[in-house]
Amino acid sequence: MSIEDASFIAKAGTRAKRRKQEVEMGTLKQSEITPEPIGEGRTRYLAHTEKLMMAVIDFRDGPTREPDPPHSHPHEQISYVVSGELLVFIGDEQTRLEPGDMFTVPPDIPHTVQLLTEHVRLVDTFHPIRDAFLSK
């Protein structure tokens, strides 16, 4: 298989029909990913392989007075703060994060964020992939 053929299997694959990008090998430009609104002032960009998912989340509705409602999921999560500042709540712990900081969330642990600046960009990674994100 050539690099051109392998670059974006999603363009012809079933997951592409659900507006998501599955990457087998190669590169993916943000301009090639369909932005997905996930609430007022929030946009998600998804890419995934068979077992790993990455979500770039742009929050443009900060700062917020209160944290978002906590949630949990059976996936492992590692997140990287690209820009902005936020509080992250994981279980009973609260930490202020800035660009370059990271946080990890074990499966099934309640967690959430509170935006401290107008714009925050996170890169979230999940294993296994979050199938619920693909069916929306």
Show where each model-derived region lies:
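Short, charged/polar surface micro-motifs in flexible loops or helix N-caps
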Residues: 52-53, 60-65, 83-86, 94, ...
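Short acidic-glycine-tyrosine-enriched beta hairpin
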Residues: 92-107
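N-terminal amphipathic/basic-hydrophobic helices that include classical n-h-c signal peptides
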Residues: 1-21
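Ligand-binding loop in jelly-roll beta-barrel domains
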Residues: 107-132
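Short strand-coil-strand connectors
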Residues: 50, 89-93, 116
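A short glycine-rich, His/Asp/Glu-containing loop-to-beta-strand
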Residues: 34-69, 124
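Short, conserved beta-strand element in jelly-roll/cupin
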Residues: 59-60, 72-88
